[in-house]
């Protein structure tokens, strides 16, 4: 106990000194230079501790809503939630809200880890959310499609830090902190009482530095894709702790057979398929402690077998000299992401807009939820932005769409996961404000029928051919073109049987 007190005291003292010095480091850097396919990357700063500026959560007052541009209207969809992280629309229009908190971990011993834990507790607020039960999935039902929730049911409770979900064939898949679980569930049910089966284990504790596991269903309905964040900032816990991490796994939903699909992604979330191209996309939180203006978080398509740099490099061949031993071979393999969002915005949610009921200005692109910075002296993020697309790729600057989460030095809330509800409006999960916001067209426009988050085509290749970007002559890459999981590895791979990020997975005998 005395040792812990000494560590905490020294850590806080160190953080105070770093905070004072940090105000000279930002230098009025224009973060807009880091938005787009070719971000400005300043020289890294070798800081003992990152800059610290934490927005204390004060919550939303009655009647307050986020700010949106003309042509849009923001309203409360559901409130009094307990750390809502993600939202997911079922084919019948019901919306699932996944609420969770960080799982228990081994006690930190390094001063910087103690500080990080302290910062995270401040940035997520306190009060009613801490007293309410979390780690549950709540169903919200808008029976007459007027944009207001008429029924609310807790579908599952007492889960292990859930985050991502997917639904197909009367089965609800839930990605928890340590496994993908499969629950029998028919649309319209108000509760789930059956026990789940474990589809596949996922890398978990005791460190579990990035614990959120997002989930997406392939357009052909055969595969699940799950994000597994790194176990550290920049491999300071050793590369062995990163086996199977900083990656997106592909999982056969029938057998649980799994393989690493894309790697070198420090903390991927917001998994979603572009409905026009069939490509998998994600948003990624990049590394810290290289200064307030490095490294930009990003959104990117994820290619089968591609390596995106972490931990050895960022944005292609920009080497992180902190990582030992160096791996020039891995740096050479690293490919840059598609689109930078600027440094430390903490992008956690993403959804495409092609089939929404939003105005034409938002008809062909993606929304990104930026949870907000804590490690630079000027706040960055704390908003939802819109990135326009053309021919399957981002084609312009990100535009602020949902703002007002900051109130001076405090935060009313923090956006996380995004989705499109059964009427075609945008939903924003606000884990600090314990609210799901609905952003709709102010003219009341709605889509004719609900479209679920999981878009499954009966004929994936025909669907892909029909949605090929204008001018494209190649077949559209998508889940239908992806190789099936190999059968020479366990159907439920253990964490240590998965290779370090970026290296090929070892061959293993089938599970008995």
Question: Across the structure, where does each feature detected by a protein language model lie?
Answer:
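Asp-box/WD-like beta-propeller blade repeats and closely related beta-sheet repeat scaffolds
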Residues: 148-171, 176-218, 233
């Amino acid at each position: 106990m005395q040792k812990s007190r000494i560590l905490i005291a020294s850590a806080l003292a160190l953080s105070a000194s770093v905070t004072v010095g940090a105000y000279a480091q930002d230098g009025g850097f224009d973060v807009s230079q880091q938005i787009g396919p070719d971000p400005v990357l300043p020289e890294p700063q070798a800081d003992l501790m990152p800059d610290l500026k934490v927005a204390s959560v004060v919550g939303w007052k009655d009647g307050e809503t986020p700010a949106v541009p003309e042509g849009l209207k923001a309203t409360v969809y559901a409130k009094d939630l307990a750390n809502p992280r993600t939202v997911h629309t079922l084919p019948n229009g019901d919306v699932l809200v996944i609420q969770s908190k960080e799982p228990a971990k081994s006690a930190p011993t390094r001063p910087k880890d103690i500080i990080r834990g302290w910062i995270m507790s401040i940035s997520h607020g306190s009060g009613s959310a801490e007293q309410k039960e979390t780690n549950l999935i709540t169903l919200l039902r808008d029976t007459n499609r007027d944009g207001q929730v008429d029924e609310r049911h807790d579908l599952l409770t007492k889960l292990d830090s859930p985050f991502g979900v997917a639904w197909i064939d009367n089965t609800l898949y839930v990605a928890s902190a340590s496994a993908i679980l499969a629950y029998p569930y028919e649309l319209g049910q108000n509760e789930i009482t059956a026990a789940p089966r474990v589809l596949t284990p996922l890398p978990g504790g005791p460190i579990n530095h990035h614990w959120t596991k997002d989930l997406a269903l392939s357009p052909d309905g055969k595969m699940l894709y799950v994000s597994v964040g790194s176990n550290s900032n920049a491999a300071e816990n050793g590369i062995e702790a990163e086996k199977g991490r900083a990656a997106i796994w592909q999982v056969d939903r029938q057998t649980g057979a799994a393989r690493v699909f894309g790697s070198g992604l420090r903390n991927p979330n917001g998994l979603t398929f572009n409905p026009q191209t069939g490509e998998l996309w994600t948003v990624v939180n990049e590394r810290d402690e290289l200064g307030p203006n490095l490294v930009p978080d990003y959104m990117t398509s994820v290619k089968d077998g591609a390596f995106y740099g972490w931990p050895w490099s960022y944005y292609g061949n920009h080497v992180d000299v902190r990582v030992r031993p160096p791996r020039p071979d891995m740096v050479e393999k690293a490919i840059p992401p598609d689109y930078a969002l600027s440094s430390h915005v903490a992008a956690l949610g993403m959804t495409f807009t092609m089939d929404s009921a939003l105005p034409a200005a938002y008809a062909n692109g993606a929304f990104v939820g930026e949870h907000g910075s804590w490690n630079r002296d000027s706040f960055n993020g704390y908003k939802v932005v819109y990135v326009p697309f053309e021919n399957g790729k981002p084609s312009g600057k990100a535009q602020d769409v949902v703002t007002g989460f900051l109130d001076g030095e405090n935060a009313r809330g923090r956006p996380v996961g995004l989705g499109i509800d059964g009427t075609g409006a945008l939903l924003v999960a606000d884990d600090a404000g314990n609210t799901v916001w609905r952003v709709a067209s102010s003219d009341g426009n709605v889509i004719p029928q609900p479209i679920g988050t999981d878009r499954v085509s009966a004929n994936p290749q025909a669907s892909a051919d029909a949605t090929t970007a204008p001018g494209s002559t190649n077949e559209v890459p998508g889940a239908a073109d992806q190789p099936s999981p190999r059968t020479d590895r366990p159907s439920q791979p253990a964490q240590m049987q998965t290779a370090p990020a970026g290296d090929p997975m070892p061959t293993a005998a089938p599970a008995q």
